[in-house]
Amino acid sequence: MPPQKIETGHSDTIHDVVMDYYGKRVATASSDCTIKITGVSNSGGSQHLATLTGHRGPVWQVAWAHPKFGSLLASCSYDGQIILWKEGNQNQWTQAHVFTDHKVSVNSIAWAPHELGLSLACGASDGNISVFSARADGGWDTTKIDQAHPVGVTSVSWAPATEPGALVSSGMIDPVYKLASGGCDSTVKVWKFSNGSWKMDCFPALNKHTDWVRDVAWAPNLGLPKSTIASGSEDGKVIIWTIGKEGEQWEGTVLKDFKTPVWRVSWSLTGNLLAVSDGNNNVTVWKESVDGEWEQVTVVEP
């Protein structure tokens, strides 16, 4: 698909842009307190489909659920609300559920791999992470990581449901149930859910950054022999964290010092390309070479 400009119609800063599973629709979150859904096509055209209103503050992030759960979108905001939006008739969206467990800004949300069921992780400025999991009766169970990052959680990202090295995600008896998080304490942490509660799964915390961690992204690992997490920070650095087997230590390598805050890091579906957006309005794409060094493969022109 060639690069194309999308007119969203937002009246203030856009904080998040997420494409749906099929690549047909884009959801955007803005400081104008709204979410907009825009249809996109390979021919380069775009069409406004819906505006979702209900937040009372800037909307920081949006996240599409896997289509096996229907047409479902989550959003989080400075107002402390996490709203689940469900599409009934085409482009007719309603609020299916509103979570108000956090009384402060909710900064990041992420749906779990679909193999784990319908579960949403949320990180907030109160330092806590909440995970909401849908029950068969339509209700929701909540598990919490209290004071995950005491000064505030900035980002959450789920591990793939498959163990590193697996070539297929078929009939897993014991799927991986882990989260990575970043915070204002400059650390990245890994959490594992077992026996009904979340426990830290990295000792000590991953602490090569010297300022707020702005984003963490756990890489897809199908067929890859290791687990990989990318983190981007206010300190300008992107760090690639890797671990081989369970029980080993995470190792961090600086991909690059961008000399300006790094806002977002995002993996390709195959886990071999990493996109980085920085404070100079640049988006660069990186790939690991055979010798383990990271090299820039392209710049996405604005």
UniProtKB/Swiss-Prot annotation:
Q: Where in the cell is it found?
A: Golgi apparatus; Endoplasmic reticulum
Q: Keywords of this protein's UniProt record, alphabetized?
A: Endoplasmic reticulum, ER-Golgi transport, Golgi apparatus, Protein transport, Repeat, Transport, WD repeat
For this record, an example GO cellular component is: endoplasmic reticulum
Instruction: Give a GO molecular function annotation for the protein.
Output: structural molecule activity
List the Pfam families hit by this protein, alphabetically: WD40
Instruction: Tell me which Gene Ontology terms the entry assigns under biological process.
Output: protein transport; vesicle-mediated transport
Keyword Iron tagged: no
User: Where do the WD repeats lie?
Assistant: 9-48, 54-95, 101-142, 148-201, 208-251, 257-296
Q: Where does it mainly reside? A: Golgi
Q: Which PROSITE patterns match?
A: WD_REPEATS_2, WD_REPEATS_REGION
| Subunit description | Interacts with MAG5, SEC31A and SEC31B.
Matching PANTHER family, A to Z? NUCLEAR PORE COMPLEX PROTEIN SEC13 / SEH1 FAMILY MEMBER, PROTEIN TRANSPORT PROTEIN SEC13 HOMOLOG A
Q: According to its UniProt entry, what is the function of this protein?
A: Required for protein transport from the endoplasmic reticulum to the Golgi apparatus.
Q: What family is this protein classified in? A: Belongs to the WD repeat SEC13 family.
The name on file for this protein is Protein transport protein SEC13 homolog A
Species of the source: Arabidopsis thaliana
